[in-house]
């Protein structure tokens, strides 16, 4: 399963670990992904999404129906 938020599209970015002596080694910064089930009243079913915590806040703000409509408009299968 890929580490990409289904709502925001956030994915891992690459950076450096920097030691006290300023030696740099490559590392990945992973998004804070959570699997969450949402009840969709219009469809009378649960929808399971893998999303970042900022994606959860977007759903809290805009509502699950409007977010699902945007995802389907992008061509994502939900």
UniProtKB/Swiss-Prot annotation:
Signal peptide: none annotated. GO terms for molecular function: structural constituent of ribosome. One of its GO terms (biological process) is translation. One of its GO terms (cellular component) is cytosolic large ribosomal subunit. It comes from the Bacteria. InterPro entries: Ribosomal_bL28 (IPR026569), Ribosomal_bL28/bL31-like_sf (IPR034704), Ribosomal_bL28_bact-type (IPR001383), Ribosomal_bL28_sf (IPR037147). Keywords: Ribonucleoprotein, Ribosomal protein. It holds the Pfam family Ribosomal_L28. The keyword Zinc does not apply. Gene3D superfamilies: Ribosomal protein L28/L24 (2.30.170.40). Belongs to the bacterial ribosomal protein bL28 family. This is Large ribosomal subunit protein bL28. The gene is rpmB.
């Amino acid at each position: 399963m890929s580490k990409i938020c289904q709502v925001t599209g956030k994915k891992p970015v690459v950076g450096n670990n920097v030691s006290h002596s300023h030696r740099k080694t490559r590392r990945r910064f992973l998004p804070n992904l959570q699997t969450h089930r949402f009840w969709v009243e219009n469809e009378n079913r649960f929808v399971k999404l893998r999303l970042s915590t900022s994606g959860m806040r977007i759903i809290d703000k805009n509502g699950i129906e409007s977010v699902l409509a945007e995802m389907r408009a992008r061509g994502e299968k939900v």
